Amino acid sequence: MLLIPAIDLKEGRCVRLKQGLMEEATVFSDSPAETALHWFEQGARRLHLVDLNGAFAGVPQNLPAIKDILAAVAKDIPVQLGGGIRDLKTIGQYLDLGLNDVIIGTAAVKNPDFVREACKAFPGRIIVGLDAKDGMAAIDGWATVTGHHVIDLAKRFEDDGVNSIIYTDIGRDGMMSGVNIDATVKLAQAVRIPVIASGGLTGLDDIRALCAAEKRGVAGAITGRAIYEGSIDFAQAQQLADSLD
């Protein structure tokens, strides 16, 4: 199973939030590029970036930091990014910079047809990010919980060419309370698209549980606060995941 370190960007710095609250940001690094290099050196085979300011503004807000990260590691490992991606022009600009994939979140919920258009324009490069609270999709940087169930939304994207779905349980994100395995597996089994778990990864027991769920469609996991605060040693966790494959 692939473990993917997260680098959340706020005003050019690497931070972690609790439950998506910008006022609950903990700064972990003033140099996101150095952070990216660190995770690469620890054995990361992919990086997950989030433009937090962009998620709220609806347009890219951390381009200098993103460019620095890509200059540091994009030649070695694929980098994906979400946050503020609302149109095809932005997707094209990001891919031209060297990103491997882009993640459509809020725009996928508000306008599912946009996902189909993006997949046609950039085949194989589109990931859908579905963030949920109690199974219901959240949008606009998690500020609004909609009346749409994530499974119903995910099924709409099955034939569009989406390469994966990132499922985040926002009640768990940054809270160190464990991954919501049941909800992640339920989503993975409901669709033909690989699902990446996100939110709440706490320790090696979560890694073992996720690896056990791999045969049921859970293709990987994004980890953030746990690897920054040290409750998970990333290199050790990836080695464990590899040994359980």
From Swiss-Prot:
- Kindly tell me the pathway this chain contributes to: Amino-acid biosynthesis; L-histidine biosynthesis; L-histidine from 5-phospho-alpha-D-ribose 1-diphosphate: step 4/9
The record's SUPFAM superfamilies line, in alphabetical order, gives:
Ribulose-phoshate binding barrel
* GO MF annotation list: 1-(5-phosphoribosyl)-5-[(5-phosphoribosylamino)methylideneamino]imidazole-4-carboxamide isomerase activity
- Catalysis performed (reactions): 1-(5-phospho-beta-D-ribosyl)-5-[(5-phospho-beta-D-ribosylamino)methylideneamino]imidazole-4-carboxamide = 5-[(5-phospho-1-deoxy-D-ribulos-1-ylimino)methylamino]-1-(5-phospho-beta-D-ribosyl)imidazole-4-carboxamide
Predominant location of this chain? cytoplasm
- One annotated GO biological process: L-tryptophan biosynthetic process
NCBIfam families named in the record: 1-(5-phosphoribosyl)-5-[(5-phosphoribosylamino)methylideneamino]imidazole-4-carboxamide isomerase, PRK13585.1
- What EC identifiers does the entry list? 5.3.1.16
* Keyword Amino-acid biosynthesis appears in the UniProt entry: yes
Q: Which InterPro entries match?
A: Aldolase_TIM, His_biosynth, HisA_bact_arch, Isoase_HisA-like, Isoase_HisA-like_bact, RibuloseP-bd_barrel
Q: Which organism is it from?
A: Neisseria meningitidis serogroup A / serotype 4A (strain DSM 15465 / Z2491)
Name of the protein: 1-(5-phosphoribosyl)-5-[(5-phosphoribosylamino)methylideneamino] imidazole-4-carboxamide isomerase
**Gene3D superfamilies reported in the protein's UniProt record:** Aldolase class I
